[in-house]
Swiss-Prot record:
A GO BP entry: cysteinyl-tRNA aminoacylation
Organism listed in the record: Staphylococcus aureus (strain JH9)
Subunit text: Monomer.
Protein name: Cysteine--tRNA ligase
Similarity remark: Belongs to the class-I aminoacyl-tRNA synthetase family.
Ubl conjugation in keyword set: no
């Protein structure tokens, strides 16, 4: 039984899907005017884990994440680079797939784009105007916020609270300062589309409402995104969607915490703005992913090199223990009286599932993985090992790897295959027996250059990848 924290109700709730065995999930994606930063990577990774865990529990997940390919930032970038908005969007959509692919994020079921849904957006806005929820003014179209009675229910703010500080900017023609834009009148030189309201382009909030509606229907199970989107973006999505669809927009709302850089908010002005495109050249993407899930998704996370190094060390510990298990699989036998270890492995798996069922607590799930590694390290020191126990270890390691999306072997592990390493170790042993120490040292140095470290153990020479 999976429980998750619902921002809408401010409490944990048992997940009950609209359709048995199926999860309809919408995650707000990036505005594709630049490479994504690590703040964008966090929701991509966190909600990928959520999806993976639902699938592990037998659900069919329809996972939709959009691309905002029409926006003020894109238009500004287009003018700076003297390139068309579609050209820039295509470049950074491709870059997004490359970056999150390196972080082992699975491809979405669908990645809708605003430009592909322009006719749908225009019709959606027209429907809202016809229903009295929106109005045209000065070439723009605005949503009548006060007409939607539930406005503020996600961010838990009242209309009176929101009215304080609300204002009408120059050039706006709103009836009320709280109203927000659905359609923007075209400006000279900007990309625009024909509509019943005149030339223009959609506002940001309406885009997600329409794409979610056309991809997943009037009501979805889970809508997710960063905490910064809770208000006004997600609040406005609810207002538009529920006014139009006459049905709840999403049953569960999930929001992930912020990322700080050395305990400071990430911003261009502070010079601590980190692009995934750049950082994965310096930090192993598997380590970056492991670091991101080492903290519960709703908690803020602090990024610095010391903490990333700690994550690298922790992942290495897990991988080294798995390598030991794989090595012992070669000499394991069918021996009895191993139920104690089977029971201990099952207990760790049960704990992993328990903490993941509790609002996808990846931090505690990783603790369970460490405990599995500790037990594995203990088991391989036994004089004899059981095929049944070794297979059980391998199966549970694979479950943890699949759910958390962290591979059991480094992407560089195939530079020199394990069997090739074993052959070189045998050759080195023979060289040492024959007192050919020059050759033995040559092999050791060659392995070291491949980041392979040799260790003498009671069972003979073994290796690990550094």
């Amino acid at each position: 039984m999976i429980t998750l924290y619902n921002t809408l109700t401010r409490q944990k709730e048992v997940f009950k899907p609209i359709e048995p065995g199926k999860v309809k999930m919408y995650v707000c994606g990036p505005t594709v005017y630049n490479y994504i930063h690590i703040g964008n990577a966090r929701p991509a990774i966190n909600y990928d884990v959520v999806r993976r865990y639902f699938e592990y529990q037998g659900y069919n997940v329809e996972y939709v994440s959009n691309f905002t390919d029409v926006d003020d930032k894109l238009i500004k970038r287009s003018q700076e680079l003297n390139q068309s908005v579609p050209e820039i969007a295509e470049k950074y959509i491709a870059a997004f797939h490359e970056d999150v692919g390196a972080l082992n994020v699975r491809k979405a079921t669908s990645n809708p784009r605003v430009m592909d849904h322009m006719d749908d957006i225009i019709q959606f806005i027209k429907d809202l105007v016809d229903q009295g929820y929106a109005y045209e003014s000065g070439g723009d179209v605005y949503f009548r916020t006060r007409k939607f009675e539930g406005y503020g229910k996600l961010s838990h703010q009242s209309i009176d609270d929101l009215k304080v500080g609300a204002r009408i900017d120059a050039g706006e023609h709103k009836e009320d300062a709280l109203d927000f834009t659905l359609w923007k009148k075209a400006k000279p030189g900007e990309i625009s589309w024909n509509s019943p309201f005149g030339e223009g382009r959609p506002g940001w909030h309406i885009e997600c409402s329409v794409m979610a509606f056309h991809e997943l229907g009037p009501t979805i199970d889970i809508h997710a995104g960063g905490s910064d989107l809770q208000f006004p973006h997600h609040e406005n999505e609810i207002a538009q969607s529920e006014a139009h669809n006459h049905a709840p927009f999403a049953n569960y709302w999930m929001h992930n915490g912020f990322i700080n850089i050395d305990n400071e908010k990430m911003s261009k002005s502070l010079g601590n703005f980190i692009l995934v495109h750049d950082i994965i050249k310096e930090v192993d993407p598997d380590v970056l992913r492991f670091f991101m899930i080492s903290v519960h998704y709703r908690s803020p996370i602090n990024y610095n090199l010391e903490l990333v190094e700690s994550a690298r060390s922790g992942l290495e510990r897990i991988r080294n223990s798995y390598q030991l298990i794989e090595e012992r699989a070669q000499i394991a036998t069918n021996i009895e009286n191993q139920q104690t270890y089977i029971d201990q492995i099952d207990a760790i798996l049960n704990r992993f599932e328990t903490v993941m069922n509790d609002d996808f607590n990846t931090a505690n799930a990783i603790t369970a993985w460490y405990d599995l590694a500790k037990l594995a390290n203990k088991y391989v020191l036994e004089n004899t090992t059981s095929t049944e126990v070794i297979d059980k270890f391998k199966a549970v390691y694979q479950i943890f790897s699949d759910v958390l999306g962290v591979p059991l072997k480094s992407k560089n592990a195939d530079e020199l295959l394990d069997e090739d390493v074993e052959k070189l170790i045998e050759e080195r042993n023979e060289a040492r027996k024959n007192k050919d120490f020059a050759r033995a040292d040559e092999i050791r140095d060659m392995l070291k250059s491949q980041n392979i470290i040799l260790e003498d153990t009671p069972q003979g020479v073994r290796f690990k990848r550094g």
